[in-house]
C-alpha cells in the first residue's frame, strides 16, 4: 500500500510539471480548518507620561481597582484612583492553526478611552480569548507606538500618525492549541475562493486522475472533499502533493463591477453586448448586427454557416464619431466612449441602461 502511494505521488509530480496554463489547487482553494483565528482581550496599559485616560473614566478606574484587589492590595471604600498614567485598551491577535503552546505572536493594542498616546506604556498581563470564550494566549509587554502627539498651553496641538494604538512584537504567548480537523478527520475539505460548479468538478477530476478514482468528490460549487490517509505521518506529504496539482479552472461568470463613488469600472473578459442603441446626454451609442451567410461552393462538402457582424458607432453633438472594429464586446464600447471624452459617470450610466434594456449579457454589480 505504501509503495503504491509513493508511485502515485511520483506520477502526480510528473504530471503536474506538464500542465500548461493551469492553476494550483493551493492558489484557488483553502483547506478547511487551516485558518487564522482572531483573539481579543481587555487590558490596561500603565506607565504613560500623563497621556492616559482622563480622571473620571469609570471603566478604567474600576478595572485598575479590580486588578489591585487581585494582587492583594485593598482599596478603601470611597477612594478614587486618579491617575492619568493608565489607559484601558483592547488587545487583538491572529492565531494560526498550526501554532503550538509556548510559541509567541504579535499583538495589536488600541485605546478605548480618551487616552492621547500609548507611547512609553506597558501592557499588563492580559488573557486573549477566542470566539468560544476560551483563553488561548496571554499577552504582556512594552507597547511600540509609531505615532506621536504634542500640545501647547494655548490649546494648539500636533499629531503624527496614530499615537493611541500600537503593537507588541511577540507580545503574546500561546497557552492552548486550536482544535484542527486536519488531525482527526477522515477526509480533507478544500473550499474554493470563488465557488463555481465547473471549477469544483474539474478540481475533483484532476485529483482523481492523479491520486486514484474515488479519492475526491465535489459536494457543491464551493467544496471538494478528499479522502485522507489514516496515518497522521502521511498527511503532510499527501497534502503537499494535493495542493500542487494543477488544472484549468472554469471560466468566471461575466461580471461588471462599478464603484459609483470613484467612477471605477472593472469588466471581465467574457462580457458581450447585444444589439442596442443608447442616447446619454450629448452622447449617442449605436450598436448594429448584420447577419453574414457563408455559402460553400457547389458540390463541396461544407455547410452553410450564419454569423453576426457587429458595428458600434459613438457620436457627440460636435459630430465627432468613433467606429469600433467588428465584434461587439463591452471593452470596445467603453474604449469608444472614452475616445470621445466621456466621463466615468457617463460610462456608468450607459452600462446601467444597457443592463436594464437586457442588452448586457453580464451581472452588473454596483459597490
Swiss-Prot record:
Coiled coil: none annotated. Pfam families: FlgI. Keywords: Bacterial flagellum, Periplasm, Signal. InterPro entries: Flag_FlgI (IPR001782). One of its GO terms (biological process) is bacterial-type flagellum-dependent cell motility. It comes from the Bacteria. GO terms for molecular function: structural molecule activity. The keyword Protein biosynthesis does not apply. GO terms for cellular component: bacterial-type flagellum basal body, distal rod, P ring; outer membrane-bounded periplasmic space. Assembles around the rod to form the L-ring and probably protects the motor/basal body from shearing forces during rotation. Belongs to the FlgI family. The basal body constitutes a major portion of the flagellar organelle and consists of four rings (L,P,S, and M) mounted on a central rod. This is Flagellar P-ring protein. It comes from Legionella pneumophila subsp. pneumophila (strain Philadelphia 1 / ATCC 33152 / DSM 7513). The lineage of its organism: Bacteria, Pseudomonadati, Pseudomonadota, Gammaproteobacteria, Legionellales.
Amino acid at each position: 500500500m505504501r509503495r503504491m502511494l509513493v508511485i502515485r505521488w511520483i506520477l502526480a509530480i510528473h504530471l503536474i510539471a506538464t500542465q500548461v496554463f493551469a492553476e494550483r489547487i493551493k492558489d484557488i482553494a483553502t483547506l478547511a480548518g487551516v485558518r487564522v483565528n482572531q483573539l481579543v482581550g481587555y487590558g490596561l496599559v500603565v506607565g504613560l507620561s500623563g497621556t492616559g485616560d482622563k480622571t473620571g473614566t469609570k471603566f478604567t478606574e474600576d478595572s485598575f481597582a479590580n486588578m489591585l484587589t487581585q494582587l492583594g492590595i485593598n482599596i478603601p471604600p470611597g477612594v478614587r484612583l486618579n491617575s492619568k498614567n493608565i489607559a484601558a485598551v483592547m488587545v487583538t491577535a491572529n492565531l494560526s492553526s498550526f501554532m503550538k503552546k509556548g510559541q509567541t505572536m504579535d499583538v495589536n493594542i488600541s485605546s478605548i478611552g480618551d487616552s492621547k498616546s500609548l507611547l512609553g506604556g506597558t501592557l499588563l498581563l492580559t488573557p486573549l480569548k477566542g470566539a468560544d470564550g476560551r483563553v488561548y494566549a496571554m499577552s504582556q509587554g512594552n507597547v511600540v507606538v509609531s505615532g506621536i502627539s504634542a500640545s501647547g498651553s494655548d490649546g494648539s496641538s500636533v499629531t503624527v500618525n496614530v499615537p493611541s494604538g500600537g503593537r507588541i512584537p511577540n507580545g503574546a504567548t500561546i497557552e492552548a492549541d486550536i482544535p484542527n480537523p486536519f488531525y482527526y478527520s477522515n477526509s480533507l475539505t478544500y473550499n474554493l475562493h470563488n465557488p463555481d460548479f465547473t471549477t469544483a468538478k474539474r478540481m475533483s477530476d484532476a485529483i482523481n486522475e492523479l491520486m486514484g478514482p474515488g479519492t475526491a468528490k465535489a459536494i457543491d460549487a464551493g467544496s471538494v472533499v478528499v479522502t485522507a490517509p489514516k496515518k497522521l505521518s502521511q498527511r503532510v506529504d499527501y497534502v503537499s502533493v494535493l495542493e500542487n496539482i494543477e488544472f484549468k479552472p472554469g471560466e468566471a461568470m461575466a461580471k461588471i463591477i462599478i464603484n459609483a463613488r470613484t467612477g471605477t469600472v472593472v469588466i471581465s473578459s467574457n462580457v458581450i453586448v447585444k444589439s442596442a442603441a443608447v442616447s446619454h446626454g450629448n452622447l449617442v451609442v449605436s450598436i448594429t448586427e448584420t447577419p453574414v451567410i457563408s455559402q460553400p461552393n457547389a458540390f463541396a462538402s461544407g455547410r452553410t454557416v450564419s454569423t453576426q457582424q457587429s458595428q458600434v458607432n459613438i457620436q457627440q453633438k460636435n459630430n465627432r464619431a468613433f467606429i469600433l472594429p467588428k465584434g461587439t464586446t463591452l471593452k470596445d464600447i467603453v474604449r469608444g466612449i472614452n475616445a470621445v471624452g466621456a466621463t466615468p459617470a457617463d460610462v456608468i450610466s450607459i452600462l446601467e441602461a444597457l443592463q436594464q434594456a437586457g442588452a448586457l449579457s453580464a451581472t452588473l454589480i454596483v459597490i
